[in-house]
Amino acid sequence: MARILITSALPYINGIKHLGNLAGSMLPADVYARFKRAQGHETLYICATDEHGTPAELAAAAAGQDVATYCAEQHVLQHEVGRAFGLSWDHFGRSSSPQNHRLTQHFCQALEDHGLIEERVDQMVYSVDDKRFLPDRYVEGTCPHCKFEKARGDQCDNCGNLLDPTDLIDPYSVISGSRNIEVRDTKHLYLLQTKMQDKIRAWVDAHADWPPLARSIAYKHLDEGLIDRGITRDLAWGIPVAQDGVPRPGFEEKVFYVWFDAPIEYIAATQEWAEGSPDRDWKRWWRTDAGADDVRYVQFMGKDNVAFHTVSFPATILGSEEPWKSVDMLKAFNWLNWYGGKFSTSNKRGVFMDAALEILPPDLWRWYLTANSPEGSDTAFTWEQFASAVNRDLADVLGNFVNRILKFNESKFEGVVPAGGEPGPLEEKLFADVSARLADLAEQMDAIEIRKSAQALRALWVVGNEYLQEAAPWTAIKTDRDRAAVIVRTALNLAALYAKISAPFIPFAAEKIGDAFGLDFPASWPSNDAKAELNTLSVGRPITVPEVLFKKIEDEQIAEWTARFGGAE
């Protein structure tokens, strides 16, 4: 059985993440990790805060803190809110860790040993008024490709093209707003991606099973021709350009570029996870010469991160010529937008994870964000659509079914699994239907089709309601108690089954349902044999009735949240 390594794109340290960040990487990765664990696979889900680069320095300055203190505090906050959302990371690390310092410096040396690192005198944007170079996000201006007026110095958020600060039209300093900008010489290290063009293309070619979104972005950059990328920056905060603790001459005041060290943190975070635990070995997950051959590595990220993960990081891994495990499946997502525009951390636009939990339980958000996963195209959050998904799917379908059958059982069968009767034609039809739908759900989950998986899960919930409505135990109990017992026993088993298969999506509610049956959680994933799965509860087993699982969202609440967070604009 394959071991499953899962990473989700590292959330930036500059504040609590918004729902778009959650929907496009961390949440689907968690759903998949929970599913694979339930199937019995040895699964490792790794994530970390991305703590270097200009976003960290700018956010720390705005908060009036030194950057190290700011990052330490924000890491704790992001970890806490992620756990509150049910994100089941095996480890949530920090890209500023000593492990990542050592490993990033190691990769640079390995690449240089193979002729893929070159020192170049570069022309970089310099702010005369700020008396400093302006790397990456310290400078903004007009994108030369799409003319977006707030493009950053590393990437345009509008068209997605990777940029250098000198590419920008009419640049200005993010620090001061000054347009008193010059271009000056500065020395930097470059990763010679041009030498890796054929090797990276062959690597991408070998992954024909990647989703079209990931492949199309990868080939766009390959077809345009790879360029050599600067991997150092004129910044104070970051990983020093050094080897064995000795600064590289001429680079004493420079650090590695955040997009060089951030993906390496996937490996370094696994080292963090393993450190101090003799039973954990990071190498068996990452080194093919140390047992990682049976690992299936799946990455989750938004589409704006794909270029770095299909070009720059592979250039690092492949260029080192060391036996590192590379990604098998790259699952990319489009954007979850906020009504007609984008969520924005810097502009505080949209609902953020901490605020979301202030108003509603995590499962409601988890369900909406997976059922409306932005896989095939960008999707837009609206309060009305959110309320509809919660009320229709969770309250009316799953919650209604569980509540009805458990209360009926408590009323008519003393709250225990009833004995009596044998399954009839209606149950046989149900067994066949549920078996087929379980197979479909597992197939969609294995394919990492998040939205289709949610649809398949909801379809299984609907089957239970339809069965209960057609079987009508409230009518059967009046004339045939054994027949009513069969119906109730079958429906109770369905509810227990729902707890197991819903857990990757709505783990808190699933555990509440499981607790009503005395099930151990997390539970194993069921087989596709519904006849067997719907006969697992022993006769006489006590069943309790939980509190209402899902409260409906009312129009008054929508109005209140629209006033607080915004809406149609």
Curated annotation (Swiss-Prot):
Protein name, per record: Methionine--tRNA ligase
Subcellular location: Cytoplasm
InterPro entries cross-referenced by the UniProt entry: Anticodon_Met, Met-tRNA_ligase_1, Met-tRNA_synth, Methionyl/Leucyl_tRNA_Synth, MetRS_core, MetRS_Zn, Rossmann-like_a/b/a_fold, tRNAsynth_Ia_anticodon-bd
Organism field: Caulobacter vibrioides (strain NA1000 / CB15N)
Cofactor: Zn(2+)
Alphabetic keyword roster: Aminoacyl-tRNA synthetase, ATP-binding, Cytoplasm, Ligase, Metal-binding, Nucleotide-binding, Protein biosynthesis, Zinc
Residues holding ATP: 345
Gene3D superfamilies registered for this protein in UniProt: HUPs, Isoleucyl-tRNA Synthetase, Domain 1, Methionyl-tRNA synthetase, Zn-domain
Subunit structure: Monomer.
Gene: metG
Catalytic reaction annotation: tRNA(Met) + L-methionine + ATP = L-methionyl-tRNA(Met) + AMP + diphosphate
